[in-house]
Amino acid sequence: MAKTYDYLFKLLLIGDSGVGKTCLLFRFSEDAFNTTFISTIGIDFKIRTIELDGKKIKLQIWDTAGQERFRTITTAYYRGAMGIMLVYDITNEKSFDNIKNWIRNIEEHASSDVERMILGNKCDMNDKRQVSKERGEKLAIDYGIKFLETSAKSSANVEEAFFTLARDIMTKLNRKMNDSNSAGAGGPVKITENRSKKTSFFRCSLL
């Protein structure tokens, strides 16, 4: 059967239990919202194909369990991820504080140049906010990561978040292909991991 997409990107949603990762996934993949989701057991995924710059990109989005007892299972999925969204709940201070621990997990288990984005979810619940937008932005700047506040319930910034991450991945792939073409003088293209550019790339376009 003919392939119906030009690229396949594997994305990962990580963060504490209850921050809304599953709700974000369902909002993006099915444009649906459900307040009765139970906590993810282990890992699950959804697929949505989008179009960017005339190319069809199949997004395979993995939703991971936030509980400690599933950590060994979920970290096994970090390695093949091309983009990772770190999600916290703006009404839950602890989930924000733990973003640093999740970043440490990425550094230990994921590819060194994986694209990352921090999402402050549940921004529709501003009356219960414990984490200011400014604190989220500062944390993102400190790590050289893009940042958005989202709401799976109202759908605010959900599309933008996934499209931005996909575009960043595609930009990186295109640059690697161009670099390979220049180096190979027309030879076969081989996409390789470039560890030395990790920090400088993320700081090109903040927030």
Swiss-Prot record:
- Indicate which residues form the motif Switch 1: 31-45
- Identify the residues that bind GTP: 17-23, 35, 39-40, 66, 121-122, 124, 152-153
Q: Tell me the keywords, alphabetical order.
A: Cell membrane, Cytoplasmic vesicle, Endosome, GTP-binding, Hydrolase, Lipoprotein, Magnesium, Membrane, Metal-binding, Methylation, Nucleotide-binding, Phosphoprotein, Prenylation, Protein transport, Transport
The propeptide segment or segments lie at 205-207
Question: Which residues get modified to Phosphothreonine?
Answer: T72
For this protein, the record's Pfam families field holds: Ras (PF00071)
The protein depicted here goes by the name Ras-related protein Rab-8B
Originating organism: Homo sapiens
Q: Which gene name does the record give?
A: RAB8B
